[in-house]
Amino acid sequence: PVDSDTELNRVIPVIAGLRDAGVTISISIDTSKARVAEAALSAGANIVNDVTAGRADADMFSVVAAASCPYIMMHMLGEPRTMQDSPSYSNVVMEIRAYLSERISAARDAGISDIIIDPGIGFGKSVEHNLRLLAHVEEFAALGVPVLLGISRKRFLGAITGVEAPADRDAVTMMMHALLADKPVDIIRVHNVRMAHYVFALKSALHSAS
């Protein structure tokens, strides 16, 4: 992890530069620090993505509530440096569902209404855990807020397919997205936007013909 000043020096010039250049698409700031989130929103970001779901900084909820912006809350087991050290759950789907349900309630109590949840594929999960979460993603959709999945180029895809280099995992990423196309997922996070567009254009065409 880096400190707030380092994060600010890295991201604020980029966000401000994009807005100054006339870029109008939504920008999401990925941070667990309220100070960084507030500055990024002031510079032109529209969305806050917090991998700790508000647990790392007690001021995060108030910053997001004041901005009335979308807030992405993710599940992560432990800390980034240790999260993949033998992650263990009794029931990975139900435990993460309960965690996200509690975080939704806490965020709403703080005045946040535009909430998106992310089960945190690859963040403190084994290959088996990740697959179970994807197979039962409807459990998260049942919480009544949009569901985001970030599986692009993840290590578990490489473990299953033998594709070692992350940059070479676009094809298997898109295959998994195609398999998940009928699941109740609202947002996907990808590296290769063009290939993702092809997948969902084909899905739409096929559904239109049925």
Predicted regions and their residues:
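Active-site-adjacent loop and "lid" segments of alpha/beta metabolic enzymes
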Residues: P1-S26, T31-R35, L41-S42, N46-D109, ...
